[in-house]
């Protein structure tokens, strides 16, 4: 079981029980009138810390990316077509995506984006570990993080097929992801005090 990242059978059984609960929930909802007119959203709030090395590069275990890896499922067989996607997204993208699915006008005053709009420059998610001071960005190829309390930064592959970079390319990626992580961090801090509803 440890090969698949589970530390115990109890942990594995908790995952299996979650799947069972989703099934029972949907089976019950299918019997209700609202089912054909509802978008169900399932998302985890955190992943599992553990050895993910069987499936993912070292960063998933050593930099604890597995704790950030959660499922996201939009389910509405009468309203949306099935898709299987694997790009890097964030929990902050959920509300703008739902609003976009509803095809109603809305003002997005968050950092999130509509995942289905096709208007994406870059697939990325911000990470933060408050206690240790690490902020970072994971995208479809790399995980970059830096410590805001000390001069320390890391750039590691986030996928097995991550690109091989020259030193100049690596420096360019580091610089870009450093600027992006700082921009998101500072924007989120600003929004905390200034992004008030009317």
Please give the residue ranges for each predicted region.
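Solvent-exposed soluble domains appended to multi-pass membrane proteins
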Residues: 1-198
